[in-house]
Amino acid sequence: MTAILERRESESLWGRFCNWITSTENRLYIGWFGVLMIPTLLTATSVFIIAFIAAPPVDIDGIREPVSGSLLYGNNIISGAIIPTSAAIGLHFYPIWEAASVDEWLYNGGPYELIVLHFLLGVACYMGREWELSFRLGMRPWIAVAYSAPVAAATAVFLIYPIGQGSFSDGMPLGISGTFNFMIVFQAEHNILMHPFHMLGVAGVFGGSLFSAMHGSLVTSSLIRETTENESANAGYRFGQEEETYNIVAAHGYFGRLIFQYASFNNSRSLHFFLAAWPVVGIWFTALGISTMAFNLNGFNFNQSVVDSQGRVINTWADIINRANLGMEVMHERNAHNFPLDLAGVEVPSTNG
């Protein structure tokens, strides 16, 4: 009898825990995805802060020339970064217990792998938590779908690209100048500016900014005034009010006359779907482009493709980009190799006389 009572009590305790985890009455919703999200993001954030301040130099290229990335080793906020895991480690899973000592783990850039893997797991769980909360509240699932765009982008640069290139040392450093260095080297090696998926991403980001500004300014300019001229129009809104807060007909009429009639949405739901879908689809394509370039399916190459009737090259913008790419490739990892791959692999032309 005692055993039965204890089992009921334990089940009741577990039931209360489940109800608390999945309750939408909490100030912050936890959810089952949150059970994994909270420790992984806390771990990634804590290690990032500590490593950004105090991590010793990392042998990123695997050639016994460590690179400093932390504040205590001479960097500032702009130049500081979490240096990627050493090329000597490659794609190996490298937790602390795999190293002979903590010093060796730090020298080989172990914190980068720890931060990135916990971060990716955490943001994926954050996306799942968005879906879970939407489900509990009876909402549609599109918030999580929209968030999948930045999740895909982060996964592409921190995981898919290193897998394709064969080493976590090719992942994006966790810092401001490190991000720019990653972008420049990516252009040099993959010609990303000439990749159509990157172009779609640029259109998505800049177009999304433009459409967001257009929508916000149109709505703000067509508010239905509920206040006097001496009060702010914003003071006329009551949270949860049933009435429309702006006149979509007026906004439609303005924009239709500014551009042309069919450039303006007359359906608020279609408008907001478009505002969400445009940047999300663009960033999806960019993440897909990064993931294909990870395996060296690079951007378009039109180098020296225009020649005259005598076979002489007519330089185009593509040739200018090619020369810039070679310059950038020569400069990066300058101690790891003497020549960029496309220079080293070309046979020297023979000369007569």
Swiss-Prot record:
One biological process GO term for this chain? photosynthetic electron transport in photosystem II
| Sites marked Tyrosine radical intermediate | 161
State where chlorophyll a ChlzD1 binds.
Answer: 118
* A cellular component annotation (GO) from this entry: chloroplast thylakoid membrane
Residues engaged in binding [CaMn4O5] cluster: 170, 189, 332-333, 342, 344
- Membrane spanning stretches: 29-46, 118-133, 142-156, 197-218, 274-288
User: How is this chain modified after translation?
Assistant: Tyr-161 forms a radical intermediate that is referred to as redox-active TyrZ, YZ or Y-Z.
Q: List Phosphothreonine occurrences by residue.
A: 2
Propeptide spans which residues? 345-353
The entry's pheophytin a-binding residues are: 126
The record's top EC class is oxidoreductase
Give the InterPro entries listed for this entry: D1/D2 (IPR055266), Photo_II_D1/D2_sf (IPR036854), Photo_RC_L/M (IPR000484), Photo_RC_L/M_CS (IPR055265), PSII_D1 (IPR005867)
Molecular function (GO) terms for this protein are:
chlorophyll binding; electron transporter, transferring electrons within the cyclic electron transport pathway of photosynthesis activity; iron ion binding; oxidoreductase activity, acting on diphenols and related substances as donors, oxygen as acceptor; oxygen evolving activity
The entry's a quinone-binding residues are 215, 264-265
- What are the UniProt keywords, alphabetically? Acetylation, Calcium, Chlorophyll, Chloroplast, Chromophore, Electron transport, Herbicide resistance, Iron, Magnesium, Manganese, Membrane, Metal-binding, Oxidoreductase, Phosphoprotein, Photosynthesis, Photosystem II, Plastid, Thylakoid, Transmembrane, Transmembrane helix, Transport
Ligand binding (chlorophyll a PD1): 198
Q: Where is this site: Cleavage?
A: 344-345
| Binding-site positions, Fe cation | 215, 272
Q: What is its EC number?
A: 1.10.3.9
Q: How does it sit in the membrane?
A: Multi-pass membrane protein
Q: What does the miscellaneous comment read?
A: 2 of the reaction center chlorophylls (ChlD1 and ChlD2) are entirely coordinated by water. Herbicides such as atrazine, BNT, diuron or ioxynil bind in the Q(B) binding site and block subsequent electron transfer.
Q: Which family does it belong to?
A: Belongs to the reaction center PufL/M/PsbA/D family.
Query: What biological function has been recorded for the protein in this entry?
Result: Photosystem II (PSII) is a light-driven water:plastoquinone oxidoreductase that uses light energy to abstract electrons from H(2)O, generating O(2) and a proton gradient subsequently used for ATP formation. It consists of a core antenna complex that captures photons, and an electron transfer chain that converts photonic excitation into a charge separation. The D1/D2 (PsbA/PsbD) reaction center heterodimer binds P680, the primary electron donor of PSII as well as several subsequent electron acceptors.
Name this polypeptide is given? Photosystem II protein D1
State the organism of origin: Morus indica
- Gene this protein is translated from: psbA
